[in-house]
Amino acid sequence: MPYDAILLDMDGLMIDTEQLCAQAWRDAASELGTRIGEDTLHQLVGLSHQHCLRYLQQHPELSAHMPALALLNRQYYHRQLQHGDIPLKPGITALLDWLRQQAIPCAVGTATEGPLAQLKLQCSQLAPYFQHVVSASDVANSKPAPDIYLAAAARLQVEPARCIVLEDSVHGASAALAANMRVIIVPDIVQPPATMAKQALAVCKDLFAAQALLQQLRDV
């Protein structure tokens, strides 16, 4: 089935920031004399900052350190962003250039809060590619709820079923599927479970493979 618009996640899909975020959580926990396990960090991928805090609050060894953990995480993360270039995921520039050449509407759908999302897009020089950016600040419910992607489709004036979402995380892919959209998963830190992979249009090893698939679907 053809498509009319592409919706893209940001962290872990277009820019290589999920590792920075994970390290910020590690550093914040270490400063407080505790630690966050890797399995727990994997569960945070694709969630908004507030959703991350709610998840961590459920862990007794961490709940006692809130809200200091939240504050330190923000400080470490912003410091990392300000002290270096935001690395792009391989293939994202080629993909966005192709979407522009083909005049295919596209928008960002991110669980990051609005001001930080805009900062990341500006620093990574990806902002000019997008007229619409829907963030966690713009909706009542962030991923894995469908609100972000439904809002992005509405801004583009495209029916959800005519959108394809590019996502790296399980939470983000769940949001796309809940919005009745097709999703191509390009895993970053965590591979999707088999049940999720079966529901996806495809699981691609990188953005080059995702672009090739989009080109094939465009030619159908």
Segments the model singles out, each with a brief description of its role:
Residues 1-42:
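Active-site neighborhood of HAD-like aspartate-dependent phosphohydrolases
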Residues 1-4, 97-100, 113-220:
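Asp-based, Mg2+/Mn2+-dependent phosphohydrolase catalytic module
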Residues 57-93:
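Metal-dependent phosphoesterase signature
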Residues 81-108, 114, 118:
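Short, acidic loop-to-helix structural element flanking the phosphoryl-transfer center
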Residues 14, 88, 106, 141, ...:
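Conserved SAM-binding loop
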Residues 28-29, 48-63, 120, 152-153:
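Helix-loop "lid/cap" segments that line or gate small-molecule binding pockets
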Residues 21-24, 45-49, 69-77, 113:
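Hydrophobic/aromatic residues within well-ordered alpha-helical segments
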